[in-house]
A protein has these predicted regions:
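Two-component histidine phosphotransfer core
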Residues: 1, 14-15
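Phosphate-coordinating loops and pocket residues in cytosolic domains that bind phosphorylated ligands
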Residues: 18
């Protein structure tokens, strides 16, 4: 996970964040967060009839939340325990992804064209 990489390389990551490589670091964190969330949301979606576009949107929403949290954590000198925070957020948000996927089953087809990277 991205947090493990950051924890294992705190000094390097902090230097990157405070340098010209900040944008690259943010892109990397965003990319890793996306892979994690896409896999997780797809796994939860297996037993639903959620629309493909909604699966993508839900994963993207949580990718943004996760990556922003990690970037903010780096920006504030990584003083809090990311595992404890992640665990707590997980407990607070438990079931929301499945609930959103179930809602997708009953929504009209989404016809707007867009691409998320």
């Amino acid at each position: 996970m991205a947090a493990k990489f950051i924890l294992d390389n705190k000094k390097v990551v902090k230097h990157m964040y405070e340098s010209d490589y900040k944008v690259e670091l943010e892109k990397y964190i965003f990319s890793i967060s996306g892979e994690i969330m896409k896999k997780y949301v797809r796994r939860v979606a297996v037993d639903t009839k959620a629309q493909e576009i909604d699966i993508t949107l839900i994963a993207y929403f949580y990718q943004c939340a996760l990556s922003s949290s990690l970037i903010q954590w780096v920006a504030t000198d990584m003083k809090t325990d990311p595992k404890a925070i992640t665990r707590r957020i997980g407990e607070l948000m438990d079931g929301n992804i499945l609930l959103s996927l179930k809602r997708s089953e009953n929504l009209e087809k989404f016809t707007q064209n867009f691409e998320i990277e």
